[in-house]
Amino acid sequence: MGKTPDWSRLEAYAGSMSKAEFEQAWQQIYSEKNGLPPPFKFTDTHLEVPTGQLAKTTCRIPFRADKEASTSDQKPSWRRARDLPPLEERPPLSDLHIALDPGHIGGSWAMMEERFLSFKPGEDIREGDLSLLTAKILKERLVKEGAIVSLVRESLDPVTTKRPADFEAESRKVLTDAGFPTPAASYQGLTGDAKLLTVQWQSEKLFYRVSEIHARGERVNQQIKPDVVLCLHFNAESWGDATSPQFSPKNHLHVLVNGCYSPGELQQQDVRFEMLLRLLSRVHEEEIPLATTVAESMARVTRLPAYLYSTPNARQAGSNPYVYARNLLANRLYECPVVYLEPFVMNHEETYHRLRGQHFLGRTLIGGKLVTSAIEDYVNGIVRGLLSYYQTNRPS
């Protein structure tokens, strides 16, 4: 579903970045830690990227010399903290446009998304519902601090106008091309790999994992045009059979920025283009310090330990143990700094009951222990982190 890249957008960054700056960003953020060479090459003078298009097979972007000023006047739509107008005794987030992206969809779609968790008949939590509630409370707090706040999703309905049925033909072709010429239409009564190899499962995945995120990307990039996006999620450990889920003893926090692209991912021309657009527009120079400050605040408020990635699809971004670089569709498509939050494990027993309590102020008794609202802690962690970052980095 990726768009055909407009390579002239990269060419507009000619002379904006030195080879040393490009190489550092590539090696420390955007590549896998011990990855293979990328499907593009750079010399002392320029970057050369295969486009995958017959009319123009390569895109060439000259580097600027180390001691020369930038020769590009290309400016992104978003603003760094240092580029915001002086505060002049106004609220600390004045002029800052924040988009809040509540993860997943929730509501009647939660079971399809596999973001529905219930340990007892008549009770459940749904990540899409929780993330939307968190976003609405967070918006109120941020507006009080002067921010302009837009919600990417405002209800328990999809942003995309497409539905799973729109992807049945494409899903059937995917399965046929993968060596399954007669895939089952429905996964009714199926589990495990057998369920994954059905037209229904593949169609649903294209709907909520791909089409929905592309629709949100269009809204962010074409309509909202914020200075920063906060993607609000709740994490989970494997809970086994959804009809008989298991609690996990683990509870943790991590924050994601964009990066850590595998050579295989970069073989796709749209992914290659989107990664280079982020790199050349220097999104990481704002995204990583902002994410780090928010992560530090979230850690203080929630008192959660850092999640530890053991897979090669993520790498630490900087020295903060809570912040990782990972290539996700949302943090790649949104053309501005994106802070992607993953606090709390929904199937951790205490967290599950805290989340069932929705949002409350103060403390309440859960499992014989006085606890705060997980959603209130989530909101407070973000607000304090944003205040710290922008009060430190914007003109006074």
Which residues does each predicted region cover?
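Non-catalytic propeptide/linker segments at domain boundaries
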Residues: 2-103, 109, 164, 173
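Solvent-exposed, acidic/flexible segments
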Residues: 15, 91, 124-135, 206-214, ...
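Active-site histidine-acidic residue metal-binding/catalytic motifs
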Residues: 84-219, 238, 248-252, 259, ...
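Structural recognition of the beta-strand scaffold that forms the well-ordered cores
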Residues: 97-101, 149-153, 227-232, 254-257, ...
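Sec-exported extracytoplasmic/periplasmic mature domains
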Residues: 136-147, 221-225, 234, 295-304, ...
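Surface-exposed patches in mature extracellular/periplasmic domains of secreted proteins
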Residues: 145-156, 207, 229-233, 302-316, ...
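Mature extracellular/periplasmic domains of secretome proteins
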Residues: 213-226, 244-248, 328-333, 338
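Active-site-adjacent mobile loop/cap segments within catalytic or ligand-binding domains
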Residues: 238-239, 256-263, 268-285, 289-291, ...
